Amino acid sequence: MKLSCLLLTLAIIFVLTIVHAPNVKAKALADPESDAVGFADAVGEADPFDITKLNIKKLTKATCKVISKGASMCKVLFDKKKQE
């Protein structure tokens, strides 16, 4: 049961990371009337992110809240399973 709680917590962190990641747009730079040997380039543009504006305290608090809620949910499930 402890392993599944760890996996659940990691899955939640993974999903939150994907949701809060900056948007990346890919654009094809090809001639519209190109032949079958034409080329395509993908250009990614991300929002600028300044690491100095990152509030570590808020980020740490939010991460701890998510992990503690996940742990408490796992504890409740584990206790229910133990009673059965």
Swiss-Prot record:
It comes from the Eukaryota. Residues 1-21 form the signal peptide. The keyword Signal applies. Residues 22-48 form a propeptide. One of its GO terms (cellular component) is extracellular region. Pfam families: Pilosulin. Keywords: Antibiotic, Antimicrobial, Secreted, Signal. The keyword Secreted applies. Belongs to the formicidae venom precursor-01 superfamily. Ant pilosulin family. Shows activity against E.coli and S.aureus (MIC<6.25 uM), moderate activity against P.aeruginosa (MIC<25 uM), weak activity against B.subtilis (MIC<50 uM), and has no effect against L.garvieae, C.albicans, and S.cerevisiae. Has no hemolytic nor cytolytic activity. Causes an IgE-independent histamine release. This is M-myrmeciitoxin-Mb2a. It comes from Myrmecia banksi (Jack jumper ant).
